[in-house]
UniProtKB/Swiss-Prot annotation:
It is found in: Cytoplasm; Nucleus; Cytoplasm, Cell cortex; Apical cell membrane. Residues 177-188 have a biased composition (Polar residues). Residues 227-277, 336-384 form a coiled coil. This is Suppressor APC domain-containing protein 2. The keyword Coiled coil applies. Interacts with a spindle orientation complex at least composed of GNAI1, GPSM2 and NUMA1. Interacts with GPSM2 (via TPR motifs); this interaction is required to prevent GPSM2 anchoring at the mitotic apical cortex and is inhibited in presence of NUMA1 in a dose dependent manner. Interacts with PARD3. Residues 1-23, 95-125, 150-188 are annotated as: Disordered. It comes from the Eukaryota. It holds the Pfam family Suppressor_APC. Keywords: Cell cycle, Cell division, Cell junction, Cell membrane, Coiled coil, Cytoplasm, Membrane, Mitosis, Nucleus, Phosphoprotein, Tight junction. Plays a role in planar mitotic spindle orientation in retinal progenitor cells (RPCs) and promotes the production of symmetric terminal divisions. Negatively regulates the mitotic apical cortex localization of GPSM2. Involved also in positive regulation of cell proliferation and tumor cell growth. The gene is SAPCD2. The modification Phosphoserine is found at residue 284. GO terms for cellular component: apical cortex; apical junction complex; apical plasma membrane; bicellular tight junction; cytosol; nucleolus; nucleoplasm.
Length: 394
C-alpha cells in the first residue's frame, strides 16, 4: 500500500485539456470568427489580451457585460496571446458564470400550495443551411432531434432572436452527428448570452432580414464602415491628383503669359523696323522654336480632357456639378484659333519679305540697264575721237 501511495505521488498530473469549440452551433462560431478576425487586424492568428482590453475598456464600451474580460484573463496563457479557441473558451466561461451564478440564499422556500416552477428551457439552434439562423427557447425532450426553424420563428419575441439575417459562408467542416445537436443546456445558454453581448457591442437597431446574396458589413464597436473608409481613401487620392494638376496649370498659365508677351514684343519690333536685315532675314529665330509642337499637343490634350469631362457629366440627368464650358462644333477651340492666327501672321511676314526682295531685284535691274547704257555711250564717243581704224568689240 505504501508503494502504491508513493507511485501515486510521483505520477505527473495529466495536462489540462486544450480549449475546444465543440458544443456551439456553426452560425454562432462564424459570428465569433468574424469578431476575432476584426480584432486580429495583423492576421497573426492570435490577439494579445492587452489589445482586447484597450478596445473594450474605452468610453464606448460602457455596456460591456460583466465578467467578459475576467473570463478571457482566466483562459489566457502566460504570453497573453489568445487563439480563436481560447477566445471562445473565455467567452463561454464568462457567460456561464454570468448565466449560472449562485442563487440568492435568502430566497424563501416554496410553499406546499404553490405551483412547481416550470422546467428549464433549452436553446434550439437552427442548422446553418437555412436562410436565417434563429435561436428559440422551447422545451426539448431528451432523445428528440431539434426541429427546423419554420416561418413561425420570425414572429417570436425580440429576446429570442439573436442571429444574423443570413448565414455567412464558412470553411468546409466535417458534418456533425445527430448527437452533437443535443448539447448540455449550459453551452446553449452560453451561446444565447454571447449573442446578446455581441448585440450590445454593436449598438445598432435590429434591421429587416437581408436578401440572399447581399453582402454583410462588419463594423467595429466605434461603428466605422470599411467601405466608407475605402471611399474616403479614394477621394483623398483624387483630391491630391487634382491639386497637383491645378498647381501645374497655374505654372503653365504663367509660362503662357510670358511667351505671349515675348511674341507681342517681337511683333511690335518687327513692325517698327521692317527694313532691318536682322529681323527680316529668313534664318531669324522663332519665339517658341522646337517647343511649338509640344505646346500644340498640350492644348489638344486639354481640349480632349474637357470634352470627355463634359460628355461624362452630361450622361446622368440629375447632375449637381458645375456646368462645363460649352464646346460646340461651330466654334473651334481656343488653341486652334491661336494656331490659325499665328499661321496668318507668319504668312503676312513672308509675303512682306518677298515683296521687299522683289523691289530690291527691280532696283538692281534698273541700275544694271543704266550702267550698260552709259557704257555704250562712252564707247561711241571714243570711236568718233579715235578714227576709223580704232574699233572696239563688245
Amino acid at each position: 500500500m505504501a508503494g502504491a501511495a508513493m507511485a501515486e505521488r510521483g505520477r505527473v498530473p495529466p495536462p489540462a485539456p486544450a480549449p475546444s469549440t465543440e458544443g456551439l452551433p456553426r452560425a454562432f462560431l462564424q459570428s465569433l470568427r468574424t469578431l476575432f478576425d476584426i480584432l486580429d487586424d495583423r492576421r497573426r492568428g492570435c490577439v494579445h489580451l492587452r489589445e482586447i482590453e484597450s478596445r473594450w475598456q474605452g468610453t464606448d464600451a460602457r455596456e460591456l457585460p460583466r465578467g467578459v474580460l475576467e473570463g478571457l484573463r482566466q483562459v489566457a496563457p502566460a504570453s497573453g496571446y489568445l487563439t480563436f479557441e481560447r477566445f471562445v473558451a473565455g467567452l463561454r466561461t464568462s457567460l456561464l458564470s454570468a448565466d449560472g451564478g449562485p442563487r440568492d440564499p435568502t430566497r424563501a422556500p416554496a410553499r406546499p400550495g404553490d405551483q412547481p416552477p416550470p422546467p428549464p428551457q433549452r436553446l434550439v439552434f437552427a442548422p446553418a443551411d437555412e436562410p436565417r439562423t434563429v435561436l428559440e427557447r422551447k422545451p426539448l425532450p431528451l432523445g428528440v432531434r431539434a426541429p427546423l426553424a419554420g416561418p413561425s420563428a420570425a414572429a417570436r419575441s425580440p429576446e429570442q432572436l439573436c442571429a444574423p439575417a443570413e448565414a455567412a459562408p464558412c470553411p468546409a467542416e466535417p458534418e456533425r452527428s445527430q448527437s452533437a445537436a443535443l448539447e448540455p443546456s449550459s453551452s446553449a445558454d452560453a451561446g444565447a448570452v454571447a449573442c446578446r453581448a455581441l448585440e450590445a457591442d454593436s449598438g445598432d437597431a435590429r434591421r429587416a432580414p437581408r436578401a440572399r446574396g447581399e453582402r454583410r458589413r462588419h463594423t467595429i464597436a466605434s461603428g466605422v464602415d470599411c467601405g466608407l473608409l475605402k471611399q474616403m481613401k479614394e477621394l483623398e487620392q483624387e483630391k491630391e491628383v487634382l491639386l497637383q494638376g491645378l498647381e501645374m496649370m497655374a505654372r503653365g498659365r504663367d509660362w503662357y503669359q510670358q511667351q505671349l508677351q515675348r511674341v507681342q514684343e517681337r511683333q511690335r519690333r518687327l513692325g517698327q523696323s521692317r527694313a532691318s536685315a536682322d529681323f527680316g532675314a529668313a534664318g531669324s529665330p522663332r519665339p517658341l522654336g522646337r517647343l511649338l509642337p509640344k505646346v500644340q499637343e498640350v492644348a489638344r490634350c486639354l481640349g480632349e480632357l474637357l470634352a470627355a469631362a463634359c460628355a461624362s457629366r452630361a450622361l446622368p440627368p440629375s447632375s449637381s456639378g458645375p456646368p462645363c464650358p460649352a464646346l460646340t462644333s461651330t466654334s473651334p477651340p481656343v488653341w486652334q484659333q491661336q494656331t490659325i492666327l499665328m499661321l496668318k501672321e507668319q504668312n503676312r511676314l513672308l509675303t512682306q519679305e518677298v515683296t521687299e526682295k522683289s523691289e530690291r531685284i527691280t532696283q538692281l535691274e534698273q541700275e544694271k540697264s543704266a550702267l550698260i547704257k552709259q557704257l555704250f555711250e562712252a564707247r561711241a564717243l571714243s570711236q568718233q575721237d579715235g578714227g576709223p581704224l580704232d574699233s572696239t568689240f563688245i
